[in-house]
């Protein structure tokens, strides 16, 4: 039997306390505010040398594409603020050249996603991940990633792509599993 999370904050608290165990990510900060945006959780991927933004959702009435590209654009246009946040929170000395901005991504975590949300990230190269989280009556937790089934690139969309997608697409590159395991 699954038991619902009462608040989005409950999901956030659980994940932030376990970013290393769940995603092999180093927790940096919670509720990072920059300009008019507030990022739920900021993490750093030590293996890929990149920042990862985690957003939590309890409802199904939001666009992951709009929010994801807005946050990646915010990051890429304010790199020094992200490095400063890391250095101040981790008491470290990360430099701009130490970060692979092209590997940055946004993870969305929710008890469920609707069909439109799942289809919106159904491209091989969008830097977004959807993870469904469930809590069971025996206090067990499950996290399941929605896997893209498409080989289509978002870069192949015809017509006017929004400038934010173009700008982020120039800097962020999603690596395939085949590329990831070459040379390892």
Predicted regions mapped to residue ranges:
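Charged, terminal alpha-helix-loop-beta segments
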Residues: 1-184
């Amino acid at each position: 039997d699954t038991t619902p999370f009462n608040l989005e904050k409950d999901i956030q608290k659980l994940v932030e306390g376990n970013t290393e165990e769940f995603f092999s990510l180093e927790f940096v900060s919670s509720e990072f505010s920059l300009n008019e945006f507030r990022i739920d959780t900021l993490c750093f991927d030590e293996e890929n040398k990149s920042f990862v933004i985690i957003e939590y959702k309890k409802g199904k009435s939001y666009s992951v594409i709009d929010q994801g590209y807005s946050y990646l654009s915010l990051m890429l246009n304010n790199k020094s603020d992200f490095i400063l946040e890391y250095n101040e929170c981790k008491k470290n000395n990360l430099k701009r050249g130490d970060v692979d901005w092209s590997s940055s991504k946004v993870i969305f975590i929710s008890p469920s996603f609707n069909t439109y949300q799942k289809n919106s990230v159904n491209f091989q190269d969008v830097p977004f991940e959807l993870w469904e989280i469930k809590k069971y009556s025996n206090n067990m937790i499950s996290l399941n990633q929605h896997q893209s089934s498409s080989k289509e690139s978002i870069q192949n969309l015809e017509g006017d792509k929004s400038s934010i997608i173009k700008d982020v697409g120039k800097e962020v590159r999603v690596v395939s599993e085949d590329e990831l395991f070459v040379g390892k």
